From Swiss-Prot:
Keyword Metal-binding: no
Name recorded for this polypeptide: Ankyrin repeat and SOCS box protein 2
Bias (Polar residues): 49-60
Entry GO CC: stress fiber; ubiquitin ligase complex; Z disc
GO terms for biological process, alphabetical: actin cytoskeleton organization; cardiac muscle cell development; cardiac muscle cell differentiation; heart development; heart looping; intracellular signal transduction; proteasome-mediated ubiquitin-dependent protein catabolic process; protein ubiquitination
Record note on modification: Monoubiquitinated.
Modification Phosphoserine, positions: S371
Function, in words: Substrate-recognition component of a SCF-like ECS (Elongin-Cullin-SOCS-box protein) E3 ubiquitin-protein ligase complex which mediates the ubiquitination and subsequent proteasomal degradation of target proteins. Mediates Notch-induced ubiquitination and degradation of substrates including E2A and JAK2. Required during embryonic heart development for complete heart looping. Required for cardiomyocyte differentiation. Involved in myogenic differentiation and targets filamin FLNB for proteasomal degradation but not filamin FLNA. Also targets DES for proteasomal degradation.
PANTHER family attached to this UniProt entry: ANK_REP_REGION DOMAIN-CONTAINING PROTEIN, ANKYRIN REPEAT, PH AND SEC7 DOMAIN CONTAINING PROTEIN SECG-RELATED
UniProt lineage: Eukaryota, Metazoa, Chordata, Craniata, Vertebrata
UniProt keyword list: ANK repeat, Cytoplasm, Cytoskeleton, Phosphoprotein, Repeat, Ubl conjugation, Ubl conjugation pathway
Length: 634
């Protein structure tokens, strides 16, 4: 979107680049600019069309340098009135948009410095002009000369004002600091030879040596170290010059610093050493250099994370390999009790996991309260899961209670993580390795039912999952598997075919008597609101929930195929009577049930729910086998 500015009877669109000019103005300046433009529009009379005037080349200084020595007006008034804020802004941006006046002349001191005019500076000094007075940013001409790298001007000012050599700007920057930042080595050397203090820091406590390391300027570092700059000075984060050079993998600078007395075990505010920085950022050459100079390979930060742990977390494989070759301890845990193997499994880095497996203590893993299997399964890292299982990690190691409490469902097994992620392959891997599907507070089978994944359900049931699972925190009088499958009749029938017990659905406490009011929507999803034990929910109560009640008839019809002579309670009868097409269901429930049906139930009960899958092996006619398996319901 552009802003339109009216100029003498015509409009010119200003794009977003020009509009961005105003972003640096304060609210008061914007108001002033609007007033000036409004007054100009009112007083401007009809004139011929203006022509664009080319402006002179605009040399913008890097800083504001108002070397104003007197508040008195100039001897000769300007030829025209000074520009308002609006015209000044637009003039600064482009001379092609508006007719502008000549720009204000550059301060002669700054002009002389930028042009390297030593004679002009000497003349000013001889004329008595004070060049040791700072501007509003605290900058001296000495700072300008160092900033622009004008060695001749710098020497003139040094000789004239030797007491200003270490004077600081408002940002606590010395001329030496500015020369280092701008990498003007001749100015840097001149200042040091003149006695400049090399360890004066800016507001962030960064010294010239630190900035030289930041810019990877080895020659500047060498000069500063030769003039006794403190190689162990710390910035406000506690970082030394060696920390900075290590983070940039600058071996030449590191060599100079260590030769100049830099401590390889210096720690920042988080107890991080240069070697820790090298491992964390994957700087292998720097890491080798520090290890060669005696740095502690097992250094730990304030949160107890080791250099090896950080390298694993950031997946620096070559760094991990080097640290292990130097004897790094893979059994140092961080403050959360996690080992490098844990974080490598979480990241899913197969190669790092393979390197850590032979050197990781199983005892330390058990003490951590969480298995790498949990982390690999949680993040769907199947290759890592296979490696851990091949290394014979206990597939049934539970999460520690304090870690299980971090999950709302209080999960404890690696199998549960795989099922929650609907990862069929990982589920099969864990079950084949001996995972117990009945260890969690909430059965993984219930999660699989919620996902509607028949393959996962079949795997769990084939490996012994309890098909009549209940939820201890939400007690029901009937299996929770039925509760979870009610909204999908084909899924409900699948579970009933496999032996789910439907009898409890028709064992109502209230029978033919009056029932309490139907539950409000969502009751069965809510956690208990007080410390009282939750009441046991009857099947008819759950069926009366608004989101389920419209399926009451078909649900009862399916369940009746898997139970014998049962009595429908008054609430179930109400549901059936609410829709005339369901009358046949009520008739179906009337005892006695067909003898063939009762015999089928008797045979299935004798076989047992865990052996239902073996029905095909019975020495019976195929037609009878199909009847027992509910493949022929006629």
């Amino acid at each position: 979107m552009s802003t339109e500015i009216s100029t003498r009877g015509r409009q010119r669109a200003i794009g977003h680049e020009e509009y961005s000019l105003y972003s640096s103005l304060s609210e008061e300046e914007l108001v002033q600019m609007a007033i000036e433009q409004s007054l100009a529009d009112k007083t401007r009379g009809p004139t011929p069309a203006e022509t664009s005037v080319s402006s002179q080349t605009n040399h913008q200084p890097g800083h504001i340098h108002p070397w104003t020595r007197s508040s008195s007006p100039p001897e000769s008034p300007p030829a025209r009135a000074p520009l308002g804020l609006f015209q000044g802004v637009m003039q600064k941006y482009s001379s092609n948009l508006f007719k502008t006046s000549q720009m204000a002349a550059m301060d002669p001191v700054l002009k002389a410095i930028k042009e390297g005019d030593e004679e002009a500076l000497k003349a000013m000094i001889q004329d008595g002009k004070n060049l040791a007075e700072p501007n509003k940013e605290g900058w001296l001409p000495l700072h300008e000369a160092a900033y622009y790298g004008k060695l001749g001007c710098l020497k003139v000012l040094q000789r004239a004002y030797p007491g200003t050599i270490d004077q600081r700007t408002l940002q606590e920057e010395t001329a030496l600091y500015l020369a280092t930042c701008r990498e003007h080595l001749d100015c840097l050397l001149s200042l040091l030879q003149a006695g400049a203090e090399p360890d004066i820091s800016n507001k962030s406590r960064e010294t010239p040596l630190y900035k030289a390391c930041e810019r990877k300027n080895a020659e500047a570092v060498r000069i500063l170290v030769q003039y006794n700059a403190d190689a162990n000075h710390r910035c406000n984060r506690g970082w030394t010059a060696l920390h900075e050079s290590v983070s940039r993998n600058d071996l030449e600078v590191m060599e100079i610093l260590v030769s100049g007395g830099a401590k390889v075990e210096a720690k920042n505010v988080y107890s991080i050493t240069p070697l820790f920085v090298a491992a964390q950022s994957g700087q292998l050459e720097a890491l080798r250099f520090l290890a060669k100079h005696g740095a502690d390979i097992n250094t730990q930060a304030s949160d107890s994370a080791s250099a090896l742990y950080e390298a694993c977390k950031n997946e620096h494989e070559d760094v991990v390999e080097f640290l292990l070759s130097q004897g790094a301890d893979a059994n140092k845990a961080n403050k959360d009790g996690l080992l490098p193997l844990h974080v490598a499994s979480k990241k899913g880095n197969y190669r790092i996991v393979q390197m850590l497996l032979p050197v990781t203590s199983r005892t330390r893993v058990r003490r951590s309260g969480i298995s790498p299997l949990h982390l690999a399964a949680e993040r769907n890292h199947d290759a890592v899961l296979e490696a851990l299982l091949a290394a014979r990690f206990d597939v049934n190691t539970p999460l520690a209670p304090e870690r299980a409490r971090l999950y709302e469902d209080r999960r404890t097994s690696a199998l549960y993580f795989a099922v929650v992620n609907n990862n069929v392959y990982a589920t099969e891997l864990l079950l084949l390795a001996g995972a117990d599907p009945n260890r969690d507070v909430i059965s993984p089978l219930l999660v699989a039912i919620r996902h509607g994944c028949l393959r996962t359900m079949q795997l769990l049931l084939d490996h012994g999952a309890n098909i009549d699972a209940y939820i201890a925190t939400h007690p029901t009088a009937f299996p929770a598997t039925i509760m979870f499958a009610m909204k999908c009749l084909s899924l409900l029938k699948f579970l009933m075919d496999l032996g789910c017990d439907g009898e409890p659905c028709f064992s109502c406490l209230y029978g033919n008597g009056p029932h309490p009011p139907a539950p409000r929507s969502g009751r069965f999803n809510d956690a208990p609101v007080d410390d009282k034990a939750p009441s046991v929910v009857q099947f008819c109560e759950f069926l009366s929930a608004p989101e389920v009640s419209r399926w009451a008839g078909p649900i009862i019809d399916v369940l009746l195929d898997y139970v014998g002579n049962v009595q429908l309670c008054s609430r179930l009868k109400e549901h059936i009577d609410s829709f005339e097409d369901w009358a046949v269901i009520k008739e179906k429930a009337e005892p006695p049930r067909p003898l063939a049906h009762l015999c089928r139930l008797r045979v299935r009960k004798a076989i047992g729910k865990y052996r239902i899958k073996l029905l095909d092996t019975l020495p019976l006619p195929g037609r009878l086998i199909r009847y027992l398996k509910y493949e022929n319901t006629q």
